[in-house]
Structures are given as structure tokens and as C-alpha cells.
Design a protein with these regions (language model features):
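Amphipathic, cytosolic membrane-interfacial segments at TM-TM junctions
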Residues: 70, 74-79, 115-131
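Helix-adjacent hinge/juxtasegments
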Residues: 49, 53-93
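Juxtamembrane boundary at the C-terminal end of a transmembrane helix
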Residues: 151-167
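Transmembrane alpha-helix interface/packing and boundary motifs in multi-pass membrane proteins
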Residues: 12-30, 89-99
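Final/C-terminal transmembrane alpha-helix of multipass membrane proteins
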Residues: 135-156
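Short, non-helical or kinked segments that cap or interrupt transmembrane helices
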Residues: 21-31, 75-84
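Interfacial segments of multi-pass membrane proteins
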Residues: 30-46, 88-96, 108-117
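Alpha-helical transmembrane segments of multi-pass membrane proteins
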Residues: 16, 38, 57-66, 93-94, ...
């Protein structure tokens, strides 16, 4: 059972890193569930304090993820249409078979959303840039946290490799 927990924990850690880029999967929280599974393993020991701290960070980043793109859009004069367009553009960008669709999609989505909001093209372009910048900032933060979690996970396994490799 311990091997199952450890393998599933690694899977969740890697899925969390991937989830940093996907809007439907909360990256740091998914990675945190990897810590939770590792915590339940009898072979690998680490403190409950680390588990609680990483949970608090993951929840904080998850909440922040909803505000950063909106703040970017607002700072550059964007509307709710631009923010919705960013999300729709991200989903389309993920599905579209074009290189860099994950980056082009949110920008185009925000631009189209602002144009639908009857903004002039200069305002729409500025707001689209703000939404896109907010999206990139949020994605970068989630990616960094998920990578730190993966690094901690590897460090915990490495420090207790004797127990893990004795299987």
C-alpha cells in the first residue's frame, strides 16, 4: 500500500505542475494532495506542520489565482467581458492545434471580449494586455509553487531513501 501511496503522490505532484497551466486543474492544490498521500505512507515520515503550511500556501494561491487576472485587467482598464474572454481564450488555446495557443488564446480572448463590450480598439488592446499579463503572473506563481512542492517531495523521498528502497 505504501508503494501505491508514493507512486500516486508523485503522479499528483506532476499533475499539479501541469495544472499550473490548465484552468480546470488547480496546480498547487493538486500537488498538495500528493503531500497528503505521502503523509499517509508508513514508510515516509514528515511533519504534520509541513503538511499544514503547504495546505495554507496552496489555498492562498488558489484564492489569489482568481484575483490576479482581474487586477491586471482592471489596472489596464478592462471589463468583466475581457476577463471572461481571457478564460475562454485560454480554453480554446489549449484545444487549438497551434503552437503557443496557451499564450495566444488568453490575449485574443480578452481582446475579443473587450471589443464585444464596445470598447474602442485602443482601450480593448490595452485591457487585453492587462488580462494577459495577469494570467501570466498567476500562471507563473502557480508554477513556482508547484515546482517548490515537487522539490520538497523529492527532498523528502531522498532523505528517506533507505526506507523507500528497502521495499
Amino acid at each position: 500500500m505504501d508503494v501505491f501511496f508514493i507512486v500516486m503522490a508523485l503522479f499528483l505532484m506532476l499533475l499539479g505542475v501541469l495544472g499550473s497551466f490548465l484552468p480546470v486543474l488547480p496546480g498547487p492544490i493538486t500537488s498538495w494532495f500528493g503531500f497528503l498521500l505521502l503523509y499517509f505512507s508508513d514508510l515516509i515520515q514528515f511533519s504534520k506542520k509541513l503538511l499544514i503550511i503547504t495546505l495554507c500556501v496552496a489555498v492562498f494561491i488558489w484564492i489569489l489565482d482568481y484575483f490576479i487576472p482581474a487586477l491586471g485587467a482592471k489596472k489596464f482598464g478592462g471589463s468583466k467581458y475581457g476577463m471572461i474572454g481571457t478564460t475562454v481564450g485560454l480554453i480554446v488555446g489549449l484545444i487549438a492545434p497551434i503552437p503557443a495557443g496557451i499564450f495566444i488564446g488568453p490575449f485574443l480572448g480578452a481582446l475579443i471580449g473587450e471589443l464585444l463590450n464596445k470598447s474602442d480598439s485602443k482601450t480593448a488592446l490595452k485591457a487585453a494586455f492587462g488580462s494577459f499579463l495577469g494570467f501570466l503572473t498567476s500562471t507563473f506563481i502557480k508554477f513556482i509553487v508547484s515546482m517548490v512542492y515537487l522539490g520538497l517531495f523529492i527532498s523528502i523521498l531522498w532523505n528517506q531513501k533507505a526506507a523507500f528502497l528497502s521495499l
